[in-house]
Amino acid sequence: MFCFRKPSDSDIKQYINDRREEQFAYSNLYGTQDYATKEEYEMDPKYSNFDVDQVKIQLGTGVECFQKAVAALKQWKHFDLDWVDFYFKNTPIAVGETVGILSKQVGFWILSFARINYLYDGDQEDGSIKFGYSYGTLKDHVEKGEERFVIEWVRDPDGAPDKGAVYYEMLSFSEPSYWLSQLGYPVTRYFQNKFVVDSCNQMLKAVGSNQNVRHV
């Protein structure tokens, strides 16, 4: 949704309430469960019309880092960016919850809506522990597609709680849903990449890391 003035919090709350029963606005629902890597998506003709993006960074090691990262995700720290307003940060990470993302890009306020459609929470078959979620776009989102946000702790084989890499992963597939998005495709891709970099840095900050991501 393109806006010439910044919507009020009450307007956004009403927009979200109006969309609680709205259907997802893209094909390949739950598609972010299909594969582990970007390369696998790019080999599947089903995703040939989508831009597929993936980044996976190490946040640190051990259970303490994992717990900090999970807490940050639950508080939506990965959206705590100076050019993005997230609505609303008291929203629990639960299937069916709808959220709004507002950003200012090239003179427009862009307001988008997405709904959480599945979760990761607990032990995985490979022995790792994951916490995270996926959300899919609703009508009026400038893109059509789905994105997953996952914290993963690859536990040490010997069970040492202070060992084992902790990762933050984002994977998405998307395509423009408006002619303005298509016309401004390079700008859209710029902001998508900027979001990935800034989100990674917020998660690194949340776990107390001194690392910094400059590009992906």
From Swiss-Prot:
Any single Pfam family the record assigns to this protein: DUF1990
Residue ranges of coiled coil: none
Taxonomic superkingdom: Eukaryota
Record InterPro entries: DUF1990 (IPR018960)
UniProt record similarity statement: Belongs to the UPF0548 family.
Database matches in PANTHER family: UPF0548 PROTEIN
Record-given protein name: UPF0548 protein
